[in-house]
Amino acid sequence: MKLFYKAGACSLSPHIVLRELGLDFTAXKVD
């Protein structure tokens, strides 16, 4: 799974959920 995020956006919550569930994901920063 890929998690696309932008600095300063509200993408922290999904990141926390993915980590807590132990799911594998790749975080990809977008401009």
UniProtKB/Swiss-Prot annotation:
Top-level taxonomic group: Bacteria
Localization of this protein: Cytoplasm
UniProt protein name: Glutathione S-transferase GST-7.3
Keyword Transferase: yes
Broadest EC class assigned to this enzyme: transferase
Enzyme Commission (EC) number: 2.5.1.18
GO CC entries: cytoplasm
